[in-house]
């Protein structure tokens, strides 16, 4: 940590730490919310497709929102977008604790997905990526991804313990309120955004998208991430309930999700560090 601190100006260093905490909170409980699937579906008499559809919409909107939020943040500042996302996500999760109509519950996936997408680490990168050196950006991205994975590692067991001790209704409201912890952290990110900016914007958002998708390598990378995300989201959604169906304790399902996050931490650090030294295409192929 001391070596990392020496590599950055103080304002940027604290912004990186704040950004990692934002990533930890925003991804942690949203990625592990599937531990609520079985108890909620059983108590409310729903088929699992209700909960699954809501999570599917959440994942879709999370992906769609991030580039739009990043583009807006690039022009108007990351702190506004992150604040909106934190509040919107908190509202979405709170609604899940009080809306017991199947259709309305499914629709909360839109609110939560937009909120978590707007307060995800890529939005923080919009601010930090302009004030760190180009060679440091790979490391910062790896660090932020590792923080998100750490959130998943902690979120699933914590949520499961809360469900067992205070019930899923109260646990949901604690999850919702955790997103409000993001708001005071935005002070540090806004300070970094005020540092001298070496990044020059030469194209608008539409042009940037056209340029990106005209590149074969980017298109292949895009669909590679799509396939990866599809499989991981499927596992995140259904693994905890499946493990309980097989007669194991709920905490076993939670720790199964947590292990995915744990090993992703190591992978994120390793890929972020390696990306500063070795060829990124070769690393992706390996």
Kindly give the residue locations of the regions a language model identified:
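Juxtamembrane cytosolic amphipathic helices that cap and anchor the N-termini
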Residues: 7-18, 210-224
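Extracytoplasmic
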Residues: 14-48, 66-69, 235-240
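Conserved MFS/SLC helix-loop-helix module at the cytosolic interface between two early adjacent transmembrane helices
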Residues: 64-102
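Helix-loop-helix hairpin linking two adjacent transmembrane segments in secondary transporters
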Residues: 144-192
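Flexible cytoplasmic inter-helical loops of multi-pass small-molecule transporters
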Residues: 188-207
